[in-house]
A protein has these predicted regions:
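Divalent metal-binding segments
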Residues: 1-101, 120, 125-177, 197-198, ...
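Acidic (Asp/Glu)-rich catalytic clusters
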Residues: 74-79, 103-113, 190-194, 215-219
Length: 317
């Protein structure tokens, strides 16, 4: 990051953090298992018994096979108290091709540890103004944020996974990033048509009406995080402007048009507290100072909020 004088200020954003992560000493398998058990314990404390997680990107120096084996050993030892659907995070097509060549595929595994989708992180976040927007930030017009992939690399990853029969889940917070993801999905499905692909958009926050229609048309899954309204109620119009904000976080519209919309907490960004997320889904306000409601017509009923954490999450996994 840069300060107001254009000097480096010591902040690292998104991919720029990779060298720092790579310098962290890699844990051995027993240490990995201890971390997993601590995570299970914390999730159980909130009543959570199943999760979707992208562990491969935590320690870049550890091969994915070590993560998988650690989970399998915990399951064999009877210690895995959370069902894990592994979202497989890769950044290079060759990594994914090798993963598939090694015999991995969405659905492979057991009820306690199962390979899930290819996971891609398409852009950053609204808070730090790193989500990729088409028209720039309303409070910083020259800043559009940025994508974390070139269009070519994202397309190569999406096409490879789709052709192999793998599910895909892509983080997209800004509308320009969402354009990229929808284009890549559309191209891949034209090349290799599939019916029950369950490809999805993770977060799906800043969006335009035309994009909501494309999501419905492609029968995509949306992995929403209603808990984000707790913070974003304070900044959404400031960041996006009134026009884009009016069609963003439109999860009720998507649901009413037949799109499967699940809910999660994005832990560790937020606490794994499903009840807090349900509260935000129903009230569309922040939790404690009750800012909002933001687009109250997008509120879920209590049953819809509960379903989003249970039935709809099962559809996404």
């Amino acid at each position: 990051g840069l300060d107001e004088n254009g000097e480096l200020d010591g902040r690292f954003y998104d991919n720029a953090m990779d060298p720092l992560y790579e310098s962290i000493k890699a844990p051995d398998r027993e240490e990995l298992k201890e971390m997993m058990l601590e995570a299970c314990k914390e999730l159980n404390r909130y009543g959570v018994t199943s999760s979707q997680t992208d562990d491969y990107c935590v320690y870049r120096s550890i091969p994915y096979s070590e993560v998988n084996e650690a989970y399998k050993e915990l399951e064999a030892e009877g210690k895995l108290t959370v069902r894990v659907y592994e979202q497989c995070n890769f950044t290079e097509p060759e990594q994914l091709r090798q993963f598939l060549a090694d015999g991995n595929m969405t659905g492979k595994g057991t009820d306690h540890f199962k390979i899930g989708p290819l996971k891609l992180l398409g852009d950053g976040a609204l808070g730090g103004r790193t989500a990729y927007l088409s028209k720039g930030y309303a409070d910083d017009p020259d800043n559009h944020g940025f994508p974390l992939f070139s269009k070519e690399t994202m397309q190569a990853l999406v096409s490879c996974a789709n052709a192999a029969g793998m599910q895909i889940a892509t983080h997209a917070i800004g509308d320009a990033c969402l354009d990229m993801v929808l284009d890549c999905y559309e191209n891949a499905l034209k090349e290799h048509p599939r019916t029950d692909h369950r490809h999805g958009i993770v977060h799906c926050q800043a969006s335009r009406a035309d994009q909501l229609e494309r999501i419905e048309k492609m029968n995509l899954h949306v992995y929403a995080q209603s808990i984000f309204l707790d913070y974003d109620n304070h900044i959404v119009e400031q960041r996006l402007g009134k026009e884009l904000a009016s069609t963003s976080y439109n999860w009720k519209t998507l649901k009413d048009h037949g799109v499967s919309v699940s809910n999660g907490t994005d832990c560790p960004v937020e606490l794994p507290d499903a009840l807090a997320g349900m509260q935000c889904a129903v009230t569309r306000t922040s939790l404690h100072d009750h800012v909002g409601p933001y687009l109250p017509e997008q509120a879920f009923s209590v049953k819809e909020a509960l379903d989003s954490y249970t039935i709809e999450s099962a559809k996404g996994s």
